[in-house]
């Protein structure tokens, strides 16, 4: 796999380009400010009167409506939530695109599943930091950065990859390393990671383990510490040193117990379900389900959010996070 670093990338290709960042949330703010601080001509496109308008203006950004930003820019970098991108694109971006323009994303979802289709003669690229916006900005200011991905779905001008790499460098990503991928690979692996591990799998594992201890008569507070609070310590070890480094830094008892029991938690049946989850991502079933959910006003999501907020582990966790000074 090719990894690009700062010395591999020439930002001169963007010298005469105007870049519109659409959205000013976590990623929008970080990427817009980093690119501006790197000397690029950046404008921010927002809904007039929206909550982010004043924030972006106070940060010194050149703020205008999405329509005006799309009309003025050579590169339109779309960093608003997946579920509203199609509507915003069709209403406020597509009418102003010109041949030779570039539309860029930090997640391939809407391009990969066909909800957004670029007009003829327009590049489609991706610049995707592998971390939250706050970290993208903080590490940039510290003189380093976080790794990132770049991809090209449509190269209408012959230099789309060079543009994407230059944007990644301007965001600070090439300081750590930029990897080339595809829209399909980024989208499908990102969704699978979220569903099977990072957001879905981990929370279900934690809550099930917590309920097991409470059901057996242990104090909920102790159960929380053992199944949730201490998870960060282990994840940090894995993040910094890998599995081997984590095993080396826990007790022999923990290592033996973990290695001999983990296969009883993640079973062959679990692996089959993971395969099924991946298939639903690959064949578009999940994307269709999410689209229908949004068109209906997200009733299932709202209901599940309410149920999550009422979990015992949430009540106990809030109390203990206050005790630890993590929550006010």
Swiss-Prot record:
Q: Which UniProt keywords apply?
A: Amino-acid biosynthesis, Branched-chain amino acid biosynthesis, Magnesium, Metal-binding, NADP, Oxidoreductase
Task: Give the residues annotated as active site.
Answer: 107
Q: Which GO terms describe its biological process?
A: isoleucine biosynthetic process; L-valine biosynthetic process
Q: Which residues bind Mg(2+) 2?
A: 190, 226, 230
Q: In which pathway does it act?
A: Amino-acid biosynthesis; L-isoleucine biosynthesis; L-isoleucine from 2-oxobutanoate: step 2/4; Amino-acid biosynthesis; L-valine biosynthesis; L-valine from pyruvate: step 2/4
SUPFAM superfamilies cross-referenced by the UniProt entry: 6-phosphogluconate dehydrogenase C-terminal domain-like (SSF48179), NAD(P)-binding Rossmann-fold domains (SSF51735)
Q: Which residues form the KARI C-terminal knotted domain?
A: 182-327
Which Gene3D superfamilies does this UniProt record tie to the protein?
6.10.240.10, NAD(P)-binding Rossmann-like Domain
Q: Which reaction does it catalyse?
A: (2R)-2,3-dihydroxy-3-methylbutanoate + NADP(+) = (2S)-2-acetolactate + NADPH + H(+); (2R,3R)-2,3-dihydroxy-3-methylpentanoate + NADP(+) = (S)-2-ethyl-2-hydroxy-3-oxobutanoate + NADPH + H(+)
Q: Which residues bind substrate?
A: 251
Q: Where does Mg(2+) 1 bind?
A: 190, 194
Claim: Oxidoreductase is one of the keywords in the record: yes
User: Enzyme class, one word?
Assistant: oxidoreductase
Instruction: Give the binding site residues for NADP(+).
Output: 24-27, 47, 52, 82-85, 133
Q: Which GO terms describe its molecular function?
A: ketol-acid reductoisomerase activity; magnesium ion binding; NADP binding
The record's comment on cofactor binding reads:
Binds 2 magnesium ions per subunit.
Superkingdom of origin organism: Archaea
Q: Does the keyword NADP apply?
A: yes
What EC number(s) has UniProt assigned to this enzyme?
1.1.1.86
Q: Which InterPro entries match?
A: 6-PGluconate_DH-like_C_sf (IPR008927), KARI (IPR013023), KARI_C (IPR000506), KARI_N (IPR013116), KARI_prok (IPR014359), NAD(P)-bd_dom_sf (IPR036291)
What is the similarity comment for this entry?
Belongs to the ketol-acid reductoisomerase family.
- NCBIfam families, sorted: ilvC (TIGR00465), PRK05479.1 (NF004017), PRK13403.1 (NF009940)
The job of this chain, per UniProt, is described as: Involved in the biosynthesis of branched-chain amino acids (BCAA). Catalyzes an alkyl-migration followed by a ketol-acid reduction of (S)-2-acetolactate (S2AL) to yield (R)-2,3-dihydroxy-isovalerate. In the isomerase reaction, S2AL is rearranged via a Mg-dependent methyl migration to produce 3-hydroxy-3-methyl-2-ketobutyrate (HMKB). In the reductase reaction, this 2-ketoacid undergoes a metal-dependent reduction by NADPH to yield (R)-2,3-dihydroxy-isovalerate.
PANTHER family from the UniProt entry: KETOL-ACID REDUCTOISOMERASE, MITOCHONDRIAL
This chain belongs to the protein called: Ketol-acid reductoisomerase (NADP(+))
């Amino acid at each position: 796999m090719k990894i690009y670093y700062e010395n591999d990338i020439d930002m001169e290709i963007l010298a005469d380009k105007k870049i519109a960042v659409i959205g000013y949330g976590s990623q929008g703010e970080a990427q817009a400010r980093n690119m501006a601080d790197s000397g690029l001509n950046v404008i921010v496109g927002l809904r007039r009167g929206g909550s982010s308008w004043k924030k972006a203006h106070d940060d010194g950004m050149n703020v205008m409506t999405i329509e005006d930003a799309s009309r003025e820019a050579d590169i339109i970098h779309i960093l608003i939530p997946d579920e509203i991108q199609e509507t915003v694109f069709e209403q406020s971006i597509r009418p102003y695109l010109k041949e030779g323009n570039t539309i860029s994303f930090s997640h391939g979802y809407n391009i990969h599943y066909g909800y957004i289709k670029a007009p003829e003669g327009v590049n489609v690229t991706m610049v995707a930091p592998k971390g939250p916006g706050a970290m993208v900005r903080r590490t940039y200011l510290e003189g380093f950065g976080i790794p990132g991905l770049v991809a090209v779905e449509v190269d209408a001008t012959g230099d789309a990859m060079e543009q994407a790499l230059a944007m990644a460098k301007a965001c600070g990503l090439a300081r750590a390393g930029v990897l080339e991928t595809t829209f399909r690979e980024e989208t499908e692996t990102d969704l699978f990671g979220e569903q099977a591990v990072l957001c879905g799998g981990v929370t279900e594992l934690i809550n099930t383990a917590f309920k097991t201890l409470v059901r057996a008569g242990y104090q909920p507070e102790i159960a929380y510490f053992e199944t949730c609070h201490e998870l960060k310590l282990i994840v940090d070890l894995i993040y910094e040193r890998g599995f081997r480094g984590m095993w080396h830094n826990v007790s022999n008892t923990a290592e033996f117990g973990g290695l001999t029991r983990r296969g009883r938690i993640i079973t062959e049946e679990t692996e089959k379900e993971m395969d099924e989850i991946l298939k639903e991502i690959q064949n578009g079933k999940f994307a269709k389900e999410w689209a229908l959910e949004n068109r209906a006003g997200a009733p299932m999501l709202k209901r599940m959010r309410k149920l999550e907020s009422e979990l015992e582990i949430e009540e106990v966790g809030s109390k203990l996070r206050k005790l630890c000074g993590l929550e006010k």
